[in-house]
Amino acid sequence: MNAFCSRQHRLFRSLVTVVGLVAVLCLPHPALASTNHHVILITIDGCAAYYLSDTKAPLRTLRKLAREGATAEGMRVSNPAITWPNHTTLVTGVHPEKHSVLFNGVLVRPGPGKPVRVDGQRDKPELVAVPTLYDQLHQAGYRTADINWPCTRRAATLDDSFPDVPDQISHMTPRLRDELIVAGILEGTNDATFRVQSAAVKDQIWTAAATHIIEKRRPNFMLLHMLVCDSTQHKYGPQSPAAYTALALADAQLAEVLRSLDRAGIRDQTTLIVTADHGFETALKIINPNVAFRKAGLLETATAPGILKARAQIVSEGGIAMVYFTDPSTFGEDQTKVLALMREQEGIADILSPHQFTALRMPDPATNRQMASLILVAKAGYAFNNEAQGDMSVTEVTLEIGNQGHHGFLSTHPKMNAPFIAWGRGVKRGARLGLIDNVDVAPTIARLLGQTLAGADGRVLVEVLEKP
């Protein structure tokens, strides 16, 4: 009898355990409530908002998404209007004053009298000062991925990563790298071989990598950054024949992403958001403040390109230039000299001081060592360059030299506005918005995936959602 009771007791305990486990598994899990939903955020680098209404721009796929989905008149970008800061704003919902990405890398100050430099070989934790949307989603159990997205090197919260860094192949997640080599998308593990590819070829590889992940992993949140439009416009200028060709290439890659949704069987569960990091403007005159600084004894160069010593130095962002003073012992004297020089410099529209940085949503140099002491603003038709050698503080651009297209102008410049198109699951078809802000993108994506992004500067774009 005792043995029988013991067996019955063990059986009962086992049954209770199984029933309890089933009950737990059947309970709704708030963190995983929307894991059958997918959002893909795509940036076409340098695709200005004005291209959507430009009849010369061959954007058949993008315009189809706009007709079938929701669009904005334009999207204001963050200062500085360059690639890495704005891609970071898109995934954090905050401006550079908070996320701290001010360049396409980290601004390094080696010490008094030594030139500053921008280092792009940095990991995500060294670059981004706040949590990202993909951090939050990954922690909630969502599958995450990025292809050529800035500031993602060694991001532990991306399940698949092909980061936007100089040595992309070395810093890919190993599983993805191995799969892409087997699939013939990558030729091998040599960074140098990949680095010399044209931007058009790289865009094809990045898109193929994205479609591979979509079909194999079905990520809940994917980031894809395409580059060919930016590199082409820098050389040939915006709204040039070459720029239109680059846009056609980007549009073709966008169509391939759509086809991959069908192959993966997730089109009806997917939302696409297509935007850009900045627009583009033509500038045919280049300002070289470092040349003026060298002539004034504030900077020294060597025979080879580069700066040997600098008490004052600019780092160009394109339409603005960041001014750094490296020696605290001569700061006041050097700043006075630079202000006098730049007030007389051709092509300078304004000189901004730290008390004006808050309005730009840029950090205070007193609390952020990457931030400049002054910002130079270019006049229309001008842009900045880091060149320190030569005799001319202003040079003219020719087609042979290239460098006709620029960004990095203040975000109030209308041509810096990016497009915004939302399409697919959860999007209100036909919704039309005015001018929005890029900080609105991350909280809106969070809502689409059943999450709330705490601490965002932006708002949820409820006007574009079927169920706000």
Task: Tell me what each language-model feature is.
Residues 14-28:
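Bacterial N-terminal signal peptides
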Residues 50, 200-224, 229-270, 336, ...:
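A long, amphipathic alpha-helix that forms part
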Residues 41, 61, 249-293, 445:
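Metal-dependent active-site segment of extracytoplasmic phospho-/sulfohydrolases and closely related
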Residues 95-237, 332, 343, 385:
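His/Asp/Glu-rich, glycine-adjacent segments
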Residues 50-98, 145:
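Short, structured active-site-proximal loop/turn typified by the sulfatase FGly-forming signature C/S-X-P-X-R
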Residues 1-12:
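N-terminal secretory signal peptides that target proteins for export/translocation
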Residues 29-33:
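Sec/Tat signal peptide C-region and signal peptidase I cleavage site
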Residues 130, 308-432, 436-444:
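Active-site neighborhoods of enzymes that stabilize oxyanions during catalysis
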